[in-house]
């Protein structure tokens, strides 16, 4: 019997995968933020450290080695959600050689997805707007300015075709994209990127050319 136990022990010990190398504190924080983010959409700020630990594949105590409290982790994750994230990368992937309408359709799709995600998060955490303390965070302020700069760069090449300056076109476009992506403002009838772009570029008045389409 002893030999059997010993043999089994060796067999299972040999089958066990090697233990993963421990993460640095910064990497552990990032892993916990990634695990917490989808949980906020599902549970809001009521999410528990048990759920977070399970999602991250760690013990609950691990959370408190890199965050002061659950609230600290939740607040950090919410702040991360308001950073531009991959929006900048996706805007940079838009081909500047595309026609103006196609460029604007692409940027509208990207920003609408961003707005929808932010609005869904605010509903989940019971907020009516971004937390006030986020307005002055350098990474968010700088990130939003970079988003604006990239959006403007996608419109400016066709400035001579527009009836108003590109900055004003961008302003009108952002207002319509924001409102048309907000379920309450839009009465649950969200505008599509095509509706938004065609309204900004062509208005709603019929013309012989458009009527013939």
Walk through the language-model features, giving the residues of each.
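Alpha-helical DNA-contacting segments of helix-turn-helix folds
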Residues: 40, 74-81, 118
């Amino acid at each position: 019997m002893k030999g059997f136990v010993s043999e089994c022990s060796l067999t299972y010990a040999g089958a066990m995968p090697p233990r993963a190398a421990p993460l640095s504190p910064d990497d552990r924080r990032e892993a916990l933020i990634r695990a917490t983010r989808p949980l906020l959409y599902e549970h809001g700020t009521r999410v528990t450290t048990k759920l977070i630990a399970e999602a991250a594949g760690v013990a609950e105590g691990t959370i408190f080695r890199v965050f002061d409290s659950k609230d600290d982790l939740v607040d950090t994750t919410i702040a991360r959600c308001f950073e531009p994230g991959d929006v900048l990368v996706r805007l940079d992937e838009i081909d500047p050689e595309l026609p103006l309408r196609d460029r604007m359709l692409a940027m509208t799709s990207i920003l609408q997805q961003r707005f929808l995600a932010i609005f869904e998060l605010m509903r989940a955490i019971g907020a009516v707007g971004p937390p006030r303390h986020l307005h002055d965070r350098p990474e968010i302020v700088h990130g939003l300015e970079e988003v604006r700069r990239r959006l403007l760069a996608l419109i400016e090449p066709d400035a001579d075709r527009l009836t108003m300056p590109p900055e004003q076109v961008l302003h009108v476009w952002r207002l319509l994209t924001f409102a048309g992506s907000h379920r309450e403002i839009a009465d649950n009838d969200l505008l599509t990127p095509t509706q938004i772009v065609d309204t900004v570029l062509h208005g709603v008045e019929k013309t012989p050319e458009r009527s013939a389409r």
